[in-house]
UniProtKB/Swiss-Prot annotation:
InterPro entries xrefs: Methyltransf_11, SAM-dependent_MTases_sf, Uncharacterised_MeTfrase_YrrT
Binding residues annotated for S-adenosyl-L-methionine, in chain numbering: 53, 74, 97
Root EC class: transferase
Protein name as annotated: Uncharacterized methyltransferase GTNG_2476
Family: Belongs to the methyltransferase superfamily. YrrT family.
Family matches, as Pfam families: Methyltransf_11
Function: Could be a S-adenosyl-L-methionine-dependent methyltransferase.
GO terms assigned for molecular function: S-adenosylmethionine-dependent methyltransferase activity
GO biological process, one term: methylation
Organism: Geobacillus thermodenitrificans (strain NG80-2)
Amino acid sequence: MGREFLDLFEQWAESYDQSVEGYDEQYRDVFAGYDRILSTVADKAGQVVLEFGIGTGNLTKKLLERGKTVYGIEPSAPMRKKAAEKLGERAVIMDGDFLQFPLPPEPIDTIASTYAFHHLTDAEKDEAIAKYSQLLHSGGKIVFADTAFRDKEAFRQTVEAARARGFHDLADDLEREYYTTLDVLASLFANHGFSVSFAQQNAFVWVMEAVKQTT
């Protein structure tokens, strides 16, 4: 359920914000337009948000700045510490992951996440979306930004291009984690009563907005 990558993110906690700002050349294209992407997700979110994989709290900060109530879920203790330092008392930050998490004390209208859903296998993504469908009423939404691919060939070409540039850390990451395709995601959302749209943000990342159609 993504926790197999926990050690990696506990090591990354200190330098994560530098990575998203483009200091790591291998990941510069992945995080291109990072601030704009987070703003897009924050603008699409409703008023009461359950956020998964908050990391150091960058999306959380934007949600709070827009006057939204946020319940943040993060499995990494060092990441939670960084987020708490950044956000102070403004957000509720809880230990959990995409599949196992404490329920918010009030109804939510949005589930949000950035750069994290790929930690789940496709089967786990299906399980997660099924859970979220039970939490949301009609009109509630899931707003995720994450790396995904048009099809398997696009994925293959991206990995090959990374290796050709000597970006072996990036290529290894793409092959190690569970990056999926748009058609798989569309099917998963549809199977659980969501209408979904995708908007490409850079060469890697798409914003997906899935709106609950049935109760």
